[in-house]
Amino acid sequence: MTKDNMALYMRVLELFRRTSWRMFSSSSSSGVRLRILPSSSCFFDESVQIKVSGLSPGEHVELQAKHKDDKGVVFKASATYQADGQGDVDLNHHPSRGGSYTGVEPMGLFWSMMPESPHKKLLKKDASGPVLVHIEAHRDGQILSQETNERRFMADGMKRVPVNEGRLRGTLFIPPGEGPFLEL
């Protein structure tokens, strides 16, 4: 193989390597990062902060939230944001410019979720499992980054005991540890 052919071969190989890497890389290969703070796992009634970084300054990005309940009903919300001068979007400070809601709404992607099928209500049959909300950052229909927020109703180690005595029906929740425990 001549020196010129070898150089051409190396350029083609490098081009193929770059192209195939883009074709098969994960959705976050764009350098865009979606984060849920302080953690992607929290209690159902806790607020989280959603941040997107790695965008171009002024770039528009659509955030989508999706949850499938225990009956298989899909709930969705979306909002369009414009990145600041550093290429960041922070739902605590930046306004949604359209979608399921507008304005500064830190938890807007959660409270504005609507069922795909009209007149359906969110159903959670078992409080021991989390509600999973999948959040994606999109540009022109392409997923740039994604994260799942696990929203729990019960602390780890909590025991759930069904009560069915005579006419009494209910559920007893027992926290981990020795006690004594508060009564309600």
Regions found by a protein language model. Give the residues of each.
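Extended, solvent-exposed segments with strong compositional bias
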Residues: 83-118
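N-terminal mitochondrial targeting presequence
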Residues: 1-32
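Short intrinsically disordered, low-complexity coil segments enriched in acidic
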Residues: 1-3, 181-184
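Generic detector of bulky aromatic hydrophobic side chains
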Residues: 12-16, 110, 170, 184
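A generic short-segment signal for beta-strand/edge and adjacent turn/coil regions
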Residues: 18-21, 29-34, 47-49, 101-106
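Aromatic-residue hotspot detector
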Residues: 17, 23-25, 37, 55, ...
